[in-house]
């Protein structure tokens, strides 16, 4: 073989090597790119805000885990687009109304609700996303942040004096009355009373979404689940799914604020009979700084899951206030009043469980909605508040 032929062969071989190397490098780069984005599991684009609801993160509360030797996790419902677990409820109530023909997408429609918590905000956001209007009746002592947010969202707000459920002017009754008046007006505008306390769309959405998410995120390894109870939808839906559907033998605990009747109902069965749920007895509003949970009557949503609740733990306002400050300082979790209640209960439950057990609590909403009431007091708590101080108040 001549020298020139030899050089040509070497040149061709070298080019082939370069080509093969380029292909391999490209393939490797493509593989790494694929693995990077597959691992990160970046979600697809959403068609609207309503599609962002659900699939909320589960995060370990490191300070409480370290203090107890039990893994304590918070299901961050505050990460929903309108900021609370009530986003799920609002969306499911409205979608159910659409399925029944009570609301029609693209046509004028109003959603009425009576709420002292975050449900009104969730309804306002979902209504705006789907083309409806929101009318919210609430106690006139509702936190200023929630009032301002509702008004900023364009909801019609009807403030009423706090009253017993048997009072026709109580906020739930006021919402139902306003809805009926619009229906009777004859102007053809559709109107729906959300009725979160009695509407089964409430507990069902937690059975269909929140419960399965928790089971998946914990791989079914959950020893205790803790939630407060206002309407009863969250604790019923999640507990019913975990115990009945997933067959997970976890201990379900209802965390109850001072002044609420669920503690006695769950532990001693003495609130009052289910047949009296419509409120034949006059009762005052639950006496607590906590918003969104606690009640002195039995709702349909609570009734549907009562048999799945094993225990109730009562938490007072001082414990809740201190726990909120503790979580903010030690974990960077700026939470609302009901989440603080759940966290206090988690510490109590952790004492009864073996080392390394898993507890999940619901983190309902952010402290930003409680600045003028709950956090007005919580911010005054000493920065170095200890867990012992929280529990022993």
UniProtKB/Swiss-Prot annotation:
Coiled coil: none annotated. Pyridoxal 5'-phosphate binds at residues 230-234, 338. The modification N6-(pyridoxal phosphate)lysine is found at residue 86. One of its GO terms (cellular component) is mitochondrial outer membrane. One of its GO terms (molecular function) is cysteine synthase activity. The chain crosses the membrane at residues 12-31. It is found in: Mitochondrion; Mitochondrion outer membrane. Pfam families: PALP. InterPro entries: Cys_Synth/Cystath_Beta-Synth, P-phosphate_BS, TrpB-like_PALP, TrpB-like_PALP_sf. It is a single-pass membrane protein. It catalyses: O-acetyl-L-serine + hydrogen sulfide = L-cysteine + acetate. CDD domains: CBS_like (cd01561). One of its GO terms (biological process) is cysteine biosynthetic process from serine. Keywords: Membrane, Mitochondrion, Mitochondrion outer membrane, Pyridoxal phosphate, Transferase, Transmembrane, Transmembrane helix. Its EC number is 2.5.1.47. Its cofactor is pyridoxal 5'-phosphate. Putative cysteine synthase that catalyzes the conversion of O-acetyl-L-serine (OAS) into cysteine, the last step in the cysteine biosynthesis pathway. However, this CS-like protein is unlikely to function in cysteine biosynthesis. It seems that in S.cerevisiae cysteine biosynthesis occurs exclusively through the cystathionine pathway and not via direct incorporation of sulfur into OAS. PANTHER family: CYSTATHIONINE BETA-SYNTHASE. Present with 4650 molecules/cell in log phase SD medium. Belongs to the cysteine synthase/cystathionine beta-synthase family. This is Putative mitochondrial cysteine synthase. It comes from Saccharomyces cerevisiae (strain ATCC 204508 / S288c).
């Amino acid at each position: 073989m001549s020298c020139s032929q030899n050089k040509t062969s070497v040149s061709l071989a070298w080019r082939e090597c370069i080509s093969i190397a380029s292909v391999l490098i490209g393939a490797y780069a493509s593989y790494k790119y694929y693995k990077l984005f597959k691992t990160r599991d970046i979600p697809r684009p959403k068609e609207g805000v309503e599609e962002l609801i659900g699939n909320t993160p589960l995060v370990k509360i490191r300070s409480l885990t370290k203090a107890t030797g039990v893994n304590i996790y918070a299901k961050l419902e505050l990460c929903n687009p309108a900021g609370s677990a009530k986003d799920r409820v609002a969306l499911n109530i409205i979608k159910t109304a659409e399925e029944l023909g009570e609301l029609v997408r693209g046509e004028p429609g109003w959603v009425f609700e009576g709420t002292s918590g975050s449900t009104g905000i969730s309804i306002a956001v979902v209504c705006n996303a789907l083309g409806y209007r929101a009318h919210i009746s609430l106690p006139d002592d509702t936190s200023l942040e929630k009032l301002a947010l509702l008004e900023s969202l364009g909801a019609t707000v009807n403030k009423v004096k706090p009253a017993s459920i048997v009072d026709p002017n109580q906020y739930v009754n006021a919402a139902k009355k306003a809805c009926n008046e619009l229906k009777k007006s004859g102007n053809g505008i559709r109107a729906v009373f959300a009725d979160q306390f009695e509407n089964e769309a409430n507990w069902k959405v937690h059975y269909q979404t929140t419960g399965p998410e928790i089971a998946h995120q914990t791989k079914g390894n959950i020893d205790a689940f803790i939630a407060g109870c206002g309407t009863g939808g969250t604790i019923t839906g999640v507990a019913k799914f975990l115990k009945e559907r997933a067959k997970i033998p976890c201990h379900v605990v209802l965390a109850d604020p001072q002044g609420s009747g669920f503690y006695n109902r769950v532990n001693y069965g003495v609130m009052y009979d289910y047949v009296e749920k419509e409120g034949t007895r006059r009762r005052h509003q639950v006496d607590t700084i906590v918003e969104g949970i606690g009640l002195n009557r039995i709702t349909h949503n609570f009734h549907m899951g009562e048999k799945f609740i094993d225990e109730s733990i009562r938490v007072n306002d001082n414990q809740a206030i201190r726990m909120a400050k503790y979580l903010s300082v030690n974990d960077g979790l700026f939470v609302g009043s009901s989440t603080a209640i759940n966290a206090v209960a988690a510490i109590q439950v952790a004492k009864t469980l073996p080392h390394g057990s898993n507890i999940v609590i619901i983190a309902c909403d952010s402290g930003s909605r409680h600045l003028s009431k709950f956090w007005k007091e919580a911010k005054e708590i000493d920065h170095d508040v200890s867990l012992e101080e929280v529990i022993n108040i």
